Amino acid sequence: MLGSRAVLLLLLLLWPRTAQARAVPGGSSPAWAQCQQLSQKLCTLAWSAHPPMGHVDLPREEGDAETTNDVPHIQCEDGCDPEGLRDNSQPCLQRIHQGLVFYEKLLGSDIFTGEPSLLPNGPVDQLHASLLGLRQLLQPEGHHWETEQIPSPSPSQPWQRLLLRPKILRSLQAFVAVAARVFAHGAATLTP
């Protein structure tokens, strides 16, 4: 009799977690393992597109704080911690999706136009394609994330591009590193 009570208690303890662990509305969850693989590939591509070259302090321009504030960051309130992912992973996945859209627009902008690494199958082109692939994995057919309007980058001057490219790629490296950790945890603990 004690064995059946223990089994019942175990089922009751596990049931709320599986019932609440929903990634997107409608009860579907992302393919955590596929997201993990693509996010790891994104990390590798981000580092190959812009390898580390030591610490460089670039002078801040006026309005630079504004552009820094526009860059998506995964923060505590996004629910990307293990408990937040278990209870409701949608806010976290929506934040990651928002960041992927942001960086996809930047990589497709004139900031990277003419860059040798943008040639077909170059590092930035592969990075752009992988961002698109992960974004599509996170957004199931027929479902549109409610994200803030992400403005397209304004046209840049050639001299600005040389400063913006490494800054964007460093920011992307940090973003995809956190996203990869989220997907690794999801693949390890939330996959049915």
UniProtKB/Swiss-Prot annotation:
Q: Does the keyword Isomerase apply?
A: no
Which terms does the record give in the GO molecular function aspect?
cytokine activity
Q: Which UniProt keyword terms apply here?
A: Antiviral defense, Cytokine, Disulfide bond, Immunity, Inflammatory response, Innate immunity, Secreted, Signal, Tissue remodeling
Recorded hits in InterPro entries, A to Z, give: 4_helix_cytokine-like_core, IL-23_alpha
Gene Ontology cellular component list: interleukin-23 complex
Localization (cell): Secreted
Keyword Signal in record:
yes
Top-level division of the source organism's lineage? Eukaryota
Signal peptide per UniProt: 1-21
What Gene Ontology biological process does one annotation of this record name? positive regulation of T-helper 17 cell lineage commitment
Q: Which family does it belong to?
A: Belongs to the IL-6 superfamily.
Assembly and oligomerization: Heterodimer with IL12B; disulfide-linked. The heterodimer is known as interleukin IL-23. Interacts with IL23R; this interaction enables recruitment of IL12RB1.
Function comment: Associates with IL12B to form the pro-inflammatory cytokine IL-23 that plays different roles in innate and adaptive immunity. Released by antigen-presenting cells such as dendritic cells or macrophages, binds to a heterodimeric receptor complex composed of IL12RB1 and IL23R to activate JAK2 and TYK2 which then phosphorylate the receptor to form a docking site leading to the phosphorylation of STAT3 and STAT4. This process leads to activation of several pathways including p38 MAPK or NF-kappa-B and promotes the production of pro-inflammatory cytokines such as interleukin-17A/IL17A.
- Official protein name in the record: Interleukin-23 subunit alpha
Originating gene: IL23A
